[in-house]
From Swiss-Prot:
Gene expressing this chain: yqfA
Keyword Membrane attributed: yes
Nucleus is among the record's keywords: no
Record-stated family: Belongs to the UPF0073 (Hly-III) family.
Taxonomic source organism: Escherichia coli (strain K12)
Keywords: Cell inner membrane, Cell membrane, Membrane, Transmembrane, Transmembrane helix
Protein name: UPF0073 inner membrane protein YqfA
Length: 219
């Protein structure tokens, strides 16, 4: 049986092109960002923990943008079904991956390491949830993404004391940008709402990358 192509799944063809191109740009950004972080780490003789943290962060960013680009670019229904799961699982990995340099390199305290365990545990549970029963509780996924992101408030005092003001500012701005983007994610009636959401994701990712590259990586 020939698989029917799926050009539209709630989005027009033009919207899907915008969706895939927007995160295709993010994919290039993620690759360049990871290279810059690793080159800087080697130049500064960074610890193995720091290099591992940057690798996890950069790898998770690349994975997220790759998954999203493929999901929106490939038009076949069966592939789309699995790529959608891949895309949503990658969000959990990006959240945990972004935390990693801040907690293990920037703070490196018992509280930060404890939060690190919690965040990665939640990410793995989230992936399991996505692969099994997430279709029954769609709104819960969005709530868990936001909740995981703002768990950083647990270490807000340590960040204010130990991290550069620029780093904390960029981290906070990135979180706000991600959160504001959710408005467009849920407003399906807005033309190109998903591409706009992707723009906010890119903006948040750039803020967090700059916080890590300009401050955490040079501390």
């Amino acid at each position: 049986m020939v698989q029917k192509p799926l050009i539209k799944q709630g989005y027009s063809l033009a919207e899907e092109i915008a969706n895939s191109v927007s995160h295709g740009i993010g994919l290039v950004f993620g690759i360049v960002g990871l290279v810059l972080l690793l080159v800087q780490a080697v130049d500064l003789n960074a610890s193995a923990t720091a290099i591992t943290s940057y690798s996890l962060y950069g790898g998770s960013m690349i994975l997220l943008f790759l998954a999203s680009t493929l999901y929106h670019a490939i038009p076949h229904q069966r592939a789309k079904m699995w790529l959608k799961k891949f895309d949503h699982c990658a969000i959990y990995l990006l959240i945990a991956g972004t935390y990693t340099p801040f907690l293990l390199v920037g703070l490196d305290s018992p509280l930060a390491r404890g939060l690190m365990i919690v965040i990665w545990s939640l990410a793995l549970l989230g992936i399991l949830f996505k692969l099994t029963i997430a279709h029954r509780f769609k709104i819960l996924s969005l709530v868990t993404y936001l909740a995981m992101g703002w768990l950083s408030l647990v270490v807000i005092y340590e960040m204010a004391v130990k991290l550069a003001a620029g780093s904390v500012t960029l981290l906070a701005v990135g979180g706000v940008v991600y959160s504001l983007g959710v408005i467009f994610y849920v407003c399906k009636r807005i033309p190109y709402n998903h591409a706009i959401w992707h723009g906010f994701v890119l903006g948040g990712s750039v803020c967090h990358f700059l916080a890590i590259y300009l401050y955490i990586g040079q501390a």
